C-alpha cells in the first residue's frame, strides 16, 4: 500500500462512525457521563448511569461493565482523562472502581470489587458479600490478563506485569508481577 493511502486510512480510522455516535447518545440518555473525545466501540453496560468516562478515553471493543447491585445512584465506575482500556476487559462493580488520568489497561484485565464470604456453615450462594473499592492512581499500566481484586489501590506510575493477580495494594512507582503479585523493583526513569 502506498504511503498516501496509509495516511488516508489512518485519518479515516480516527473519525467517529455514526454507530459509535448513536451508541454514545444511547448511553448518555440512560445516565452515563461521557467526556469529549472519548471513543466507545461495542461495549456491554448493565447500568449506564453508573459509568463516568473522562475526556479523550479510548475503549476497545468487547468491554463489559457489570454493576452487580440493586439500582443505586451513580456513578460507581469513574475513569479519568486519557484512559485506555484494551479489548475484552471486565469490570464487576458492586461498590466503586476508580481509574486515574492516563491509565493504560491492556486487554483481558478483570476488576472485581466484591467477594463472597467463606463461612463453612452456610451455602456459598447465601454468603455475606464483602466489598471494598478499587482505586488506580494516575499513569498506571496493567499488562494483559491482570486480575485486580477488592480493596486494591495502585499508586501513581505503578506497573503491573501481564497475568498478575493483585490481592494487595501497590505503592506508587513500583513494578509488581506474579500470582499473587509481589514487588519486582522500582519503576526507573529514562533521560
Give a label for each model feature.
Residues 1-37, 56, 102, 108-109, ...:
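Terminal amphipathic alpha-helical/low-complexity segments used for targeting or macromolecular assembly
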Residues 44-152, 179, 187-188:
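Flexible, glycine/small-residue-enriched loop-and-beta-strand segment within the central core
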Residues 143, 149, 161, 166-167:
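Short hydrophobic beta-strand segments in globular cytosolic domains
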Residues 168-173:
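Short arginine-rich
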